[in-house]
A protein has these predicted regions:
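Noncatalytic partner-interaction/assembly domains of nucleic-acid and motor enzyme complexes
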Residues: 1-97
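Intrinsic-disorder/low-complexity, polar/charged segments
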Residues: 11-15, 31-32, 105, 111-118
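Short amphipathic helix-turn segment from helical bundle oligomerization domains
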Residues: 73-79, 107-114
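Long, mid-chain structured domain cores
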Residues: 84, 97-108, 117-120
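Non-catalytic interaction/clamp surfaces of large macromolecular machines
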Residues: 104, 112-137
Length: 154
């Protein structure tokens, strides 16, 4: 399953789930061919507060094929789109991006051109690359608190 395409497609199909994913992600989390598509979706959501594929295509016509492909990828998975799934896919995308950053730094660390004095800084960057948690405030909406409370009752 192409998690990146499926997530974008899921958000286009149900924009009520966008707040559980889009604030956590950035363009760097996506592979190069999907970066413009994600940027179009995220930018439209930030400015308009909704995700309407027709309006997004009208604003970004060069992304039409990628947007439709993402929706098709999501539909072909035949899975129910829920908040939990969107959060899971978001976490997977963030973890994959962190792993790629870590691997890139690891290759740089073993490169013959890297000096010994550069290693402590590289190791620190490797540790930071694995930190996928974004800085959030202590604020939780009543809806989130209620959701968490109900989930713990089950």
């Amino acid at each position: 399953m192409d998690v990146q395409s499926v997530l974008i497609g899921a958000l286009l199909m149900d924009d009520q789930l966008a707040p559980y994913s889009l604030p956590e992600l950035s363009i760097e989390h996506f592979r190069p061919e999907l970066q413009p598509t994600f940027a179009a979706v995220q930018g439209f959501w930030i400015t308009k507060g909704i995700l309407d594929i027709m309006q997004i295509v009208a604003k970004y016509p060069d992304q039409k094929q990628n947007l439709m492909s993402c929706v098709s990828s999501c539909e072909s998975e035949c899975i129910r789109i829920t908040r939990d799934r969107v959060e899971e896919w978001t976490r997977i995308i963030m973890e994959d991006a962190a792993k790629v950053r870590f691997q890139s730094l690891a290759f740089k660390a073993v490169d013959a051109a890297t000096a010994f004095d550069d290693l402590p800084d590289l190791y620190q960057q490797m540790g930071q690359a694995l930190d996928i948690h974004t800085e959030k405030g202590d604020f939780q909406s009543v809806g989130e608190l209620l959701d968490d409370y109900i989930r713990h009752l089950d």
